[in-house]
Amino acid sequence: MADNIIIFDTTLRDGEQALKASLTVKEKLQIAFALERLGVDVMEVGFPISSAGDFESVQTIARHIKHSRVCALSRAVDKDIDAAAEALKVAEAFRIHTFIATSALHVEAKLRRTFEDVVDMAINAVKRARNYTDDVEFSCEDAGRTGVDNICRIVEAAIKAGATTVNIPDTVGYCLPYQYGDIIANVMNRVPNIDKAIISVHCHNDLGMATANSLTAVQNGARQIECTINGIGERAGNTALEEVVMAIKTRQDMFNGLDTRINTQEIHRVSQMVSQLCNMPIQPNKAIVGSNAFAHSSGIHQDGMVKHKNTYEIMSPESIGLKKEKLNLTARSGRAAVKNHMSEMGYQESDYDLDKLYEAFLKLADKKGQVFDYDLEALAFIDMQQGDEDRLTLDVITSQCISHLPASAFVQVELDGKKMSQVSNGGNGPVDAVYNAILAITGLEMKMLNYNLTAKGEGAEALGQVDIVVEHEGRRFHGVGLATDIVESSARALIHAINAIYRSQKVADLKLHKIAGV
């Protein structure tokens, strides 16, 4: 039995199967390099027999990866195994993963075979794969719905034929943790040659049990977990790599000191890369890598966090590669959180009136939702009764985009009460053309860090909400725009961010005047 947990990543095989559009070879290689830096022990990167494109991507990754074992999938069919071996032969180290269904439903309805036939096919497949490599994994597809006697029988036969890893998948996410743990315990205790192989688990999340089942399996003797970044995969997805890795790291008391060799500080970066390349947004409340995973909004929680981080944080954001936790300022935040944000921006309590600031903050939070640091500064130092209206407002916007030609836009705004207009040509799409026009009017330089479009409602009357993050002079500003037209909502989001920049500049000017004694 292995001393540590082997992490078998299948983002580029099982994960990619769930995508609406296939990744390019270049994109797959980019993810493979990221997985190698992350420290996965094995990466399953494709199913070579399925297409020429998959064969090419497996071969390309196998040629370039040096520190992780590269694996390819094959059915228990000679031509599949031969194709996998051909694609993998250029690798530093490789594994052939062969599988066959074992549940009565699959054997009878899909394969139209007997279980005895399936055992023979498994033996032949493992032996053929061993002609190419001494690292062969065998999987019992739909083991979660296979009788334990049959699982033990075919696992014993596969190991005798040369399998070095035996995988017990909950292919359709059917098992509950106690059931799955019992299956693994039976394999551990009833298969006489189990000491010659590693038990692997591959869980799907149809009932939301993938992580729990994988961890229960480890407690019962499994030593390899098959998983994907962000849990992407067929239907409801696979076990999420980041969840099992951080659970084992955080709760080593429950796993007898077992660990993985994953460099956890790479988790956030790899998660974001996979999300972007696969065009699969991460839900905000996703464990470990969601944008809210280390965000605290409750006033009671924020007060506890200010006093001692461990009150509401069982692992640090730094442990997955984030800089720090976020104390989100909302209407539920207390004085302690507001004071803490001001302190982190370098302000002493004597610089402002906390009671007045908190009162103004609550009014803004009720209206706006989340309040950012630059909002807090404006509340603290700008008299809201004396002209804190937006300096920049949108009057007119038109744009034109013709195939194969640069986009153009006309924008008219009101800046400090004066109407100004600008024509922009040469934009990379209508939104870019509008942004170029607005920035030309304001003279501001900024970098777009994030642009996110979501639909509010359904049908022709749906609104498009654009959320952006821009960087200006080393500081980040947020903007939100809402309109039925995407170009207009994009323009309103940028104008919203620009007004935040203007308020921040006003605060800076007030501070300079105070220092100068003016």
UniProtKB/Swiss-Prot annotation:
Transmembrane segments: none
Pathway(s): Amino-acid biosynthesis; L-leucine biosynthesis; L-leucine from 3-methyl-2-oxobutanoate: step 1/4
Catalytic activity: 3-methyl-2-oxobutanoate + acetyl-CoA + H2O = (2S)-2-isopropylmalate + CoA + H(+)
Keywords: Amino-acid biosynthesis, Branched-chain amino acid biosynthesis, Cytoplasm, Leucine biosynthesis, Manganese, Metal-binding, Transferase
EC class of the enzyme, as a word: transferase
Keyword Magnesium: no
Molecular functions (GO terms): 2-isopropylmalate synthase activity; acetyl-CoA C-acetyltransferase activity; manganese ion binding
Pyruvate carboxyltransferase domain segment(s): 5-268
GO cellular component: cytosol
Self-association and partners: Homodimer.
Entries under InterPro entries matching the protein: 2-IPM_HCS-like (IPR050073), 2-isopropylmalate_synth_dimer (IPR013709), AIPM/Hcit_synth_CS (IPR002034), Aldolase_TIM (IPR013785), LeuA/HCS_post-cat (IPR054691), LeuA_allosteric_dom_sf (IPR036230), LeuA_bact_synth (IPR005671), PYR_CT (IPR000891)
Organism: Pasteurella multocida (strain Pm70)
SMART domains (UniProt xref): LeuA_dimer
HAMAP family in the record: LeuA_type1 (MF_01025)
Coiled-coil intervals, chain numbering: none
Name of the protein in question: 2-isopropylmalate synthase
